[in-house]
A protein has these predicted regions:
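Short glycine-rich, Thr/Ser-proximal phosphate-binding strand/loop in the N-terminal lobe
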Residues: 3-45, 49, 123-132
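Phosphate/ATP-binding catalytic cores across multiple sugar-kinase/actin-like superfamilies
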Residues: 53, 192-214, 264, 268
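Conserved phosphate-binding/catalytic loops in two-lobed NTP-binding clefts
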Residues: 86, 234-259
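Adenine-nucleotide phosphate-binding core of ATP-dependent small-molecule kinases
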Residues: 175-207, 254
Length: 283
């Protein structure tokens, strides 16, 4: 048996996972998962703290970890051995969490991506939003702050909206102006939030069409924890006659990138040892 660690460093949080494998890389098991908000702390300290918590929880030393892999802003992890692109990591993590999915929508703080994948997590096609677009978690946090609503509450609150008004779908600045106008017109907070979620979902459904999504789609990233956003995604998917998509989430969707990094770490470790991997044997 050997262990790997996957670390997904985002702009507002660090996700860390610890996985165990059989000697041939088979039967990967998720032993530890952690999400830590960065806030104004030193990112390297946040990363190191999460790593040490994982070791302590399972009675391991740093020398017991066969491979540490990162994704996201991995250059901030000075003890990593390897780094994997975000799409590669999220795709691998998604297949681990739900083998039925053939597409992934990764909704992060700064941008979102739609990926078409195969059963072995290979990314076949992808599209992504721009950093300034109104389809990101950071945009949603800005709106929540303006409305005086806790970020953890906006999803449930948006589900109460019964007459939503959608905002501008491309530019975050214009969308925020729309929200200010809605507040001045007396639109309820629930309807504003539901309209925002629907507008964000509409943009992402457009990305899904571009990559020719068909079948089960797993939402990963921070917005997977937002029930209002997930509901808006399914509503928009159901209303799009050009798309056949079933939106899914998993309790560990937010950790998909870190899980994928840990899984690829196991693959890389065996390759470096000159051993055949479970993945290569299945090919």
């Amino acid at each position: 048996m050997f262990h790997t660690v996957g670390i997904d460093v985002g702009c507002d949080s660090v996700k860390t996972t610890l996985m165990a494998f059989e000697d041939d890389g088979s039967q990967p098991r998720l032993l530890f998962k952690d999400l830590d908000k960065i806030r104004k702390r030193n990112i390297k300290h946040v990363v190191r703290s999460a790593f040490e918590r994982a070791l302590l929880r399972h009675g391991l030393d740093e020398a017991d970890i066969a491979y540490v892999a990162t994704t996201g802003e991995g250059e901030l992890v000075d003890f990593r051995r390897g780094h994997f692109f975000s799409m590669t990591a999220h795709a691998r993590g998604a297949i681990f969490l739900d083998p039925s999915v053939r597409a992934v929508v990764d909704c992060g703080a700064l941008h979102a991506k739609a990926m078409l994948i195969d059963e072995r997590s290979k990314v076949l096609a992808y599209r992504m939003t721009s950093q300034c677009a109104s389809g990101s978690g950071q945009f949603l946090e800005n709106i929540a702050r303006y409305l005086g609503v806790a970020i953890d509450d906006i999803g449930e609150l948006s589900l109460r909206g019964d007459s939503p008004e959608q905002v501008s779908g491309i530019c975050a600045v214009l969308a925020e102006t729309d929200v200010i106008n809605m507040v001045s017109r007396g639109i309820s907070t629930a309807n504003i939030l539901r309209g925002i979620h629907l507008s964000m979902a509409k943009r992402l459904i457009g990305l899904m069409r571009m990559v020719k999504t068909n079948g089960d789609v797993l939402v990963t990233g921070g917005l997977a924890r937002n029930p209002g956003f997930v509901a808006a995604m399914q509503e928009m998917a159901d209303n799009d006659k050009r798309l056949n998509a079933n939106i899914k989430i998993h309790p560990d969707s937010v950790h998909a990138g870190a899980i994928g990094a840990a899984l690829w770490a196991g693959y890389r470790h065996l390759r470096l040892q000159g051993q055949p991997t479970a993945q290569s044997q299945a090919a």
